[in-house]
Amino acid sequence: MRTEYCGQLRQSHVGQQVTLCGWVNRRRDLGSLIFIDLRDREGIVQVFFDPDRAEALKLASELRNEFCIQVTGTVRARDEKNINADMATGEIEVLASDLTIINRSESLPLDSNHVNTEEARLKFRYLDLRRPEMAQRLKTRAKITSLVRRFMDDHGFLDIETPMLTKATPEGARDYLVPSRVHKGKFYALPQSPQLFKQLLMMSGFDRYYQIVKCFRDEDLRADRQPEFTQIDVETSFMTAPQVRELMEALVRSLWLDVKGVDLGDFPIMTFAEAERRYGSDKPDLRNPMELVDVADLLKAVEFAVFSGPANDAKGRVAALRVPGGASLSRKQIDDYGNFVKIYGAKGLAYIKVTERAKGIEGITSPVAKFLNAEIVESILERTGAQDGDMIFFGADNKKVVADALGALRLKLGKDLSLTDEAKWAPLWVIDFPMFEDDGEGGLTAMHHPFTSAKDMNADELKAAPETAIANAYDMVINGYEVGGGSVRIHSGEMQQTVFGILGINEQEQREKFGFLLDALKYGTPPHAGLAFGLDRLTMLLTGTDNIRDVIAFPKTTAAACLMTEAPSFANPASLAELGIDVVKKEEKN
């Protein structure tokens, strides 16, 4: 039906007859001439109808926005005064000779001239996706997956599919369950990741596996989370953690170079402990220059319990955050930031305004200054690197609250005060995570997943002191987003059972839930390691949006609903009966 895409026409096509198909993006009727901007997935080109082609001109008078049409015409060079430098096709136009209206369009429920609500965009997603910026994002996503496949193929990886209907296993979030008609009362689970299957593929001898795969997690959603999402899933045998990181870093660097023309350079490596200490986060945004600085040792003897209490507590922390230029913040702004940190468990926000650094305690303004002597103030100013016009905020509480509160404040201030360099790319690896964390009920839970190996510990050592174990795990972080994470896996049956035991999974449960894995570990399992990237997050970064729904063709809302199809929906009673399922309705409270 067509010979060219609209957006691909250039000067080299001048004089050629072309047939184009697409949608009317805009129409301008000048009486004897009608101009339209014709749009397809590749872009927009100007088409005009003149009186010499009377039949086409007459039909063109009926055109309205979003009519689907076919146009045949001749490509012409525009007069120099009419060249549009803002359009890729701005040096040419098409003189139409024939026009076919394939389908007319009703008035649109979306307004192309204004910002539409996200609810409207999701309800009429098929119209929203016609917008050039949305089409470009999905084209970039397709390019990314193509580049990934080429890279993985070039490095000897095999693309192997794993099951979508599998067994429910505890991986940290709730499973989406699928009832079995054949085995009434039993359920499949949609995979949260192909984790165990890719490990089994290594045990099967495939050595290098990858897959671009859908995963499902029934969890509370955030702005950058979806109930179904896509992973670039990778697993290797006989490779160390540094080797896996080197290879996956090369993959990501190649994506940025091909898609953005940016060389990311070598990724720095930072331990979990250092990231938490300096940035209050295990996914630090290194574009932001501010850092948390420990000052507890300076405040142990002050007669101010808010500081001295945590300063003398082994589980406590007192940290300072220097904000360049922050002394200009108003009282209301300071109060707002104080309320902000309360979201993260902090009780408030002490501060020092530095007006004249050279005067020491005489050159500051602070509601806590009366508790501090000149020597302490000077030490704080020196340690934080404070200068005239700076603000120093303090966090004093248990270590987690201080890290969470000041870490979040650091990000907010970086954005509010334009301290974060938005034009910069800041990738890094975070390594050496704790293997376990407190589950809040006196037990331990795996920080990554139960199949991650410990670093430099055997089973007996791990059993004796699990809370000290460091996981052989690694996360890739770019601009404050965790884009990928992985680990060296356990390849010993004894070690795997030890980890299960530490997590409170008894031997009977181990057999019921993971018997197939424990059996497989008996037969010469190779050392193996892997990683999974979030394709949606990578695409989000590479297309410059901060909304993950912008890079998914048909996403769900934060309530896990599809506004377009109205999923989820009630099932047919006959289908439920066939599955042996009764729906228990909640009683409505009066």
UniProtKB/Swiss-Prot annotation:
PROSITE patterns: AA_TRNA_LIGASE_II (PS50862). GO terms for molecular function: aspartate-tRNA ligase activity; ATP binding; nucleic acid binding. It comes from the Bacteria. It is found in: Cytoplasm. The keyword Cytoplasm applies. ATP binds at R217, D218, E219, Q226, E482, G534, L535, D536, R537. Keywords: Aminoacyl-tRNA synthetase, ATP-binding, Cytoplasm, Ligase, Nucleotide-binding, Protein biosynthesis. L-aspartate binds at E171, R217, H448, R489. It catalyses: tRNA(Asp) + L-aspartate + ATP = L-aspartyl-tRNA(Asp) + AMP + diphosphate. Its main location: cytoplasm. CDD domains: AspRS_core (cd00777), EcAspRS_like_N (cd04317). Its EC number is 6.1.1.12. GO terms for cellular component: cytoplasm. Homodimer. This is Aspartate--tRNA ligase.
